[in-house]
Amino acid sequence: DSSTSRGLGDVYKRQVLCDAIRMTGVDVRCSTKEFWESDKTYDIIHFQWPEEVVGRMCDDPGIVRRLEERIAFFRSRGTHFVYTRHNVRPHYANEVIGRAYDIIESQSDVVVHMGRFSLEEFVGKHPDSRNAVILHHIYQYTYQEDISVERARQYLQLPQEAFIVTAFGEFRNCEEIRMVLGAFRSWNEKQKLLLAPRLYPFS
């Protein structure tokens, strides 16, 4: 798994996934450090977010060559590569990040898509690629769902009468924070509450 620092929620999900795979008896590692430094032989390397492999804000053109070399090194030892395509490109990708995406997309033995649009768009650019669609899961039945809205608000210490706006995703920069805060402030609702646990860096 190529994820390293996508936030506590993502770390938790990654850990749950790795633990579940381990319980089946499969040895699994979740580490970009091992990708760059290990000489071990792996059956499969699964990329999730190419920008996490090279560093989210990386602007070192040399990393592109090193990424190609590492993939070639592992492939020479029989490793297969899987890439789960979460998005086309990050919103603020520079040229180095774009090249990392190109390399991982073109070098992966299988590309997993979370929907048809991604598959069709990708096959248009990579007609000889091997692809699979695994629909993005929904969180239904993941949590206790027999709790009332009133009881949930009481448990979370949220005002019963407030109109609650949630933003659980990661905020990558100040522009995204300003956009959410601006939209929230301009919302014509007297009793409103913004619930955005990852609004500020390191939160």
What are these regions (language model features)?
Residues 1-12:
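Single conserved hydrophobic/aromatic residue that forms the stacking wall/gate
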Residues 26, 37-64, 82-84:
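Short N-terminal targeting/anchoring amphipathic segment
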Residues 106-123, 127-144:
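Donor nucleotide-sugar binding/catalytic pocket of nucleotide-sugar-dependent glycosyltransferases
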Residues 165, 177-183, 193:
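A structural motif in glycosyltransferase catalytic domains
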Residues 192-203:
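Glycosyltransferase donor-sugar binding loop
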